């Protein structure tokens, strides 16, 4: 259940000048990503600005992207919430239109204890038992870490198939890998940690950089998996400045600016996020030119 491949793109959400969702550009971008190294599209996650999207906008994006990539790639719906009831309702609605999985972030702001986190994810999984669920641990944003012990317990639930581990803690990821079944999938939540996490048993990455270098990420992962570690390391080190530059300010501000530099009409970020300033744009332009991305 839930084979999502190795390169999952955390897709941005394009907006029009009036601030409404640009579904046409979303479809065009989705098709381009699938043609350039993306196995699965993660729609309405952090990079997709889910905190400032309405549930209706999210649902419409799921429909648009599903129709665009039908038969070519999988779609994971970001339906997370710090309300268990809302997360269940959104996930059930997404499941009915045929998404291939759901990404569920650790509930933010209200900081539930580990018992509450377990009950939250268990309830969502049980409400949609046929839908693969990917946990999403990003304590820097949520204020609460999903402990390895809780992940291990959750991995016993049939349709909880993996975790996007964005704590930045390699020891934590290692503990999860050590204590969970081999079929439980670990995905890097930071592009710069993809190769280190592959070395301790991760399957791939939920990537921001794959908007720009999806094929190169595929090459890096394939090289590592075939024993060509030096080749994989060379690709990682070549791309590392890009990985770092895409996070010099709050994601998705830099990646949206990078796409604009390539000519994509992705629009602004929604408030309270702000657009990239001149310094960020100049740094992006320099690293992208060095990699022949513009």
Swiss-Prot record:
SMART domains: DHDPS
Protein's pathway: Amino-acid biosynthesis; L-lysine biosynthesis via DAP pathway; (S)-tetrahydrodipicolinate from L-aspartate: step 3/4
Coiled-coil regions listed in the entry: none
Active site (catalytic residues): 136, 164
Compartment list: Cytoplasm
Protein family (similarity comment): Belongs to the DapA family.
Name by which UniProt lists this protein: 4-hydroxy-tetrahydrodipicolinate synthase
Native source organism of the sequence: Nostoc sp. (strain PCC 7120 / SAG 25.82 / UTEX 2576)
Organism lineage: Bacteria, Bacillati, Cyanobacteriota, Cyanophyceae, Nostocales
Gene: dapA
């Amino acid at each position: 259940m839930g084979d999502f491949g190795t390169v999952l793109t955390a897709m941005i959400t394009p907006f029009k000048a009036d601030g409404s969702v640009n579904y046409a550009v979303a479809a065009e971008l989705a098709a381009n990503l699938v043609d350039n190294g993306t196995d699965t599209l993660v729609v309405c996650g952090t990079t997709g600005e889910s905190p400032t999207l309405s549930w209706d906008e999210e649902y419409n994006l799921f429909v648009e992207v599903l129709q665009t990539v039908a038969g070519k790639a999988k779609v994971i719906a970001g339906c997370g919430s710090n309300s268990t009831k809302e997360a269940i309702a959104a996930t059930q609605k997404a499941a009915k239109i045929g998404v291939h999985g759901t990404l569920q972030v650790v509930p933010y702001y209200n900081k539930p204890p580990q018992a509450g986190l377990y009950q939250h994810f268990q309830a969502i999984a049980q409400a949609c038992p046929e839908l693969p669920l990917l946990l999403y641990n990003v304590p820097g944003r949520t204020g609460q870490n999903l402990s390895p012990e809780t992940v291990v317990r959750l991995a016993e639930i049939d349709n909880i198939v993996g975790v996007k581990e964005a704590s930045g803690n390699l020891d934590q990821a290692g503990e999860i890998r050590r204590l969970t079944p081999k079929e439980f999938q670990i995905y890097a939540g930071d592009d710069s940690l993809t190769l280190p996490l592959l070395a301790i048993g991760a399957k791939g990455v939920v990537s921001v950089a794959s908007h720009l270098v999806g094929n190169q990420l595929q090459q890096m992962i394939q090289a590592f998996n075939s024993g060509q570690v030096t080749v994989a390391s060379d690709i990682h080190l070549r791309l590392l400045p890009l990985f770092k530059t895409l996070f010099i300010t709050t994601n998705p501000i830099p990646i949206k600016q990078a796409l604009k530099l390539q000519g994509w009409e992705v629009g602004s970020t929604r408030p309270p996020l702000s657009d990239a300033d001149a310094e960020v744009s100049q740094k992006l332009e320099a690293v992208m030119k060095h990699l022949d991305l513009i």
